[in-house]
């Protein structure tokens, strides 16, 4: 297989790049280790500016997620102490990544873009422009885009000595089991070193999580 561009990672950034490439009449293949639709640790806040950018990519049918709601403000907390509300510049769409990424991926495929799901990469040869998959299939490319995150295989092409020490945890909680009735986003600072926590409501559930620098002395499960 030969492509003008191969993209590693089919999240929003990789898929957006793929749409741009297809729109410019170039061949594109996106490789992802997961099968779509799939869940993703993410609060799911998409700004008005981002939605306008996505519309400019000519995605076809407009995204209408069943669990999406619109938020216009975020509440800021220092640990459990309320500090203030901040009004957003435009709407923030609180999306379910299970739905949102599936929409972006299938719109890309409808344009003729190639997607390899459930596919792992064994090696990337940047001298000969060849990607070797674990099934020993080779893919040739002119250009490669790394959109597979901080611990992805393309990161190692830049600096093999980087040792990521950040981590993230998230759980989706049914709204019916809570008294959280607001459409406001909530951000919590001071809950752990070098990080923050969040509660982002969706139509039927709350996305609750935190991200920070890992410290083995802290019992995060408590």
What do the PLM-derived regions correspond to, one by one?
Residues 1-5:
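Extreme N-terminal starter segment of soluble prokaryotic enzymes
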Residues 6, 10, 19-42:
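Glycine-rich FAD pyrophosphate-binding loop
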Residues 14-15:
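N-terminal Rossmann-fold NAD(P) dinucleotide-binding loop
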Residues 20, 103, 107:
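Rossmann-fold NAD(P)-dependent oxidoreductase module
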Residues 41-44, 91-94, 196:
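Glycine-rich phosphate/pyrophosphate-binding beta-alpha loops
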Residues 44-48, 163:
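Short, conserved loop/turn and helix-capping segments at secondary-structure boundaries
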Residues 47-103:
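A conserved beta-strand/loop capping segment in the N-terminal third of enzymes
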Residues 107-222:
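Predominantly flavin-linked oxidoreductase catalytic cores and closely associated redox partners
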């Amino acid at each position: 297989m030969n492509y003008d561009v191969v993209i590693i990672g089919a999240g929003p950034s990789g898929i957006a790049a793929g749409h741009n490439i297809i729109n410019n009449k170039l061949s594109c293949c996106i490789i992802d280790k997961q099968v779509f639709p799939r869940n993703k640790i993410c609060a799911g806040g998409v700004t008005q500016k981002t939605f306008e950018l996505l519309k400019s990519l000519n995605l076809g049918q407009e995204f209408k997620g069943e669990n999406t709601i619109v938020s216009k403000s975020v509440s800021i907390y220092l640990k459990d102490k309320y500090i203030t509300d901040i009004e957003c510049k435009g709407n923030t769409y609180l999306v379910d990544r299970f739905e949102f990424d599936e929409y972006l991926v299938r719109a890309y495929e409808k344009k003729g873009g190639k997607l390899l799901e459930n596919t792992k990469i064994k090696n990337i040869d940047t001298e000969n422009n060849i990607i070797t998959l674990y099934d020993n299939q080779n893919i040739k490319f002119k250009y490669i885009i790394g959109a597979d995150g901080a611990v992805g295989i393309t990161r190692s092409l830049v600096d093999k000595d980087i040792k990521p020490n950040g981590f993230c945890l998230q759980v989706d909680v049914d709204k019916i089991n809570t008294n959280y009735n607001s459409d406001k986003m909530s951000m919590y600072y001071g809950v752990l070193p070098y990080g923050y926590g969040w509660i982002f409501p969706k139509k039927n559930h709350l996305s609750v999580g935190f991200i920070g620098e890992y410290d083995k002395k802290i019992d995060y499960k408590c």
